[in-house]
Swiss-Prot record:
<feature type="signal peptide">
    <location>
        <begin position="1"/>
        <end position="22"/>
    </location>
</feature>
<keyword id="KW-0413">Isomerase</keyword>
<dbReference type="GO" id="GO:0003755">
    <property type="term" value="F:peptidyl-prolyl cis-trans isomerase activity"/>
</dbReference>
<keyword id="KW-0449">Lipoprotein</keyword>
<dbReference type="InterPro" id="IPR000297">
    <property type="entry name" value="PPIase_PpiC"/>
</dbReference>
<dbReference type="InterPro" id="IPR023058">
    <property type="entry name" value="PPIase_PpiC_CS"/>
</dbReference>
<dbReference type="GO" id="GO:0005886">
    <property type="term" value="C:plasma membrane"/>
</dbReference>
<keyword id="KW-0472">Membrane</keyword>
<feature type="lipid moiety-binding region" description="N-palmitoyl cysteine">
    <location>
        <position position="23"/>
    </location>
</feature>
<comment type="similarity">
    <text>Belongs to the PrsA family.</text>
</comment>
<dbReference type="Pfam" id="PF13624">
    <property type="entry name" value="SurA_N_3"/>
</dbReference>
<protein>
    <recommendedName>
        <fullName>Foldase protein PrsA</fullName>
        <ecNumber>5.2.1.8</ecNumber>
    </recommendedName>
</protein>
<dbReference type="InterPro" id="IPR046357">
    <property type="entry name" value="PPIase_dom_sf"/>
</dbReference>
<keyword id="KW-0732">Signal</keyword>
<dbReference type="Pfam" id="PF13145">
    <property type="entry name" value="Rotamase_2"/>
</dbReference>
<feature type="lipid moiety-binding region" description="S-diacylglycerol cysteine">
    <location>
        <position position="23"/>
    </location>
</feature>
<feature type="domain" description="PpiC">
    <location>
        <begin position="194"/>
        <end position="285"/>
    </location>
</feature>
Length: 335
């Protein structure tokens, strides 16, 4: 009797294992994959189709295929890139879900009629960009992964999100004294015309090399000649000449730019350390213009500072909201 019970138990266990394994081995249908849950935010599901049909994700896939070929998604490298992109966009979808939930909580969601009206207005604004050419508008929608319906739904969500962000940042203020401080510290940004300087430099790897270069230049050796001999930058063939540079050039290393601005016309710097190595900088000439009066730029400065503070406040608030939310991600369902 005991043997029979044991056998029955083993058989039942075997059936369970086989059933479980079989279920795990059965490939999901495209419909089932589309409906599979990839994340939950406070109990609300984000499904695989929300990600796969997301216009941002579609654009990424389209760009990858154009660059690497139609089979890119099937390669190991392609799968890794797709997974990484999906994770990034999923994080954006989670953020949007948190914001939309907050919209309900804060009671800032307009009534359906008003929301549809606002969304239609935004659609018409987009159409106006294409001179109300319906064909061009539809071609652009298709190329960006939208349909008319999904665009409108997207815009409705963005309207709600904008209202939530406004609510979260409504306490942000910028005083005149904040603008005055920024103006005093960044006067080169507020000139009648952009200040520029004509710059040459010599780039070497170590500080010792830079000191040797400076010593040669202090001994009145020709800057261009020394640059051609020792510089490790592409500008060496031009004697280290970089040409005219704006004081607000965001493409330059900030440390390099700050050191160059501080030099007088004709001056040569001591070694300046940046991420690229050690530079010796020479200012060949400068064009500096009068600074605008504070009152003429005050409102622009306040607007800029307010936007920056609002961004900081929003980032802090969304991190706080996400931390307080119950968020679960189902990684295995992403691919």
């Amino acid at each position: 009797m005991r043997s029979a019970k044991k056998l029955l138990s083993v058989l039942c266990l075997g059936v369970f294992i086989l059933t479980f394994t079989a279920c795990d081995m059965v490939e999901k249908t495209p419909e089932a994959k589309a409906k599979s849950t990839i994340a939950k935010v406070n109990g609300e599901k984000i499904q695989r189709k929300d990600l796969d049909e997301n216009p941002r994700f579609k654009q990424v896939v389209s760009q990858m295929k154009m660059q690497y070929g139609e089979e890119f998604e099937k390669s190991e490298q392609g799968k890794e890139v797709i997974k990484e992109q999906k994770s990034q966009i999923l994080d954006e979808l989670i953020t949007e879900k948190v914001l939309l939930q907050k919209g309900k909580e804060l009671k800032v969601i307009p009534k359906d009629e008003e929301l549809n009206k606002e969304a239609d207005k935004k659609v018409n604004e987009i159409k106006a960009v294409y001179n109300n050419d319906e064909k061009k508008f539809e071609e652009t929608l298709k190329s960006t992964g939208f349909t008319k319906e999904t665009l409108k739904e997207y815009l409705k969500d963005q309207i709600v999100i904008e209202k939530v962000i406004n609510e979260a940042t409504k306490g942000v203020k910028v005083e005149d004294k904040d603008a005055q401080k920024y103006y005093n510290e960044n006067q080169s940004m507020f000139t009648e015309k952009p200040n520029t300087m004509n710059v040459s430099h010599i780039l070497v790897k170590t500080e010792d090399e830079a000191k040797k270069v400076k010593k040669r230049l202090d001994a009145k050796e020709d800057f261009a000649k020394v640059a051609k001999e020792v510089s490790q930058d592409g500008s060496k063939d031009k004697g280290g000449l970089l040409g005219d540079i704006s004081y607000s050039d965001s493409n330059l290393d900030p440390t390099f730019l700050k050191a160059a601005i501080a030099l007088k016309e004709g001056a040569i710097s001591n070694p300046v350390h940046t991420q690229f190595g050690y530079h010796i900088i020479k200012i060949n000439s400068k064009k500096e213009y009068p600074v605008k009066k504070f009152d003429a730029v005050k409102e622009d400065i306040k607007k800029q500072l307010k936007q920056e503070k609002q961004q900081e406040a929003y980032t802090k608030k969304i991190e706080e909201w996400k931390k307080a939310s119950k968020i679960k991600i189902y990684e295995k369902n992403l691919l």
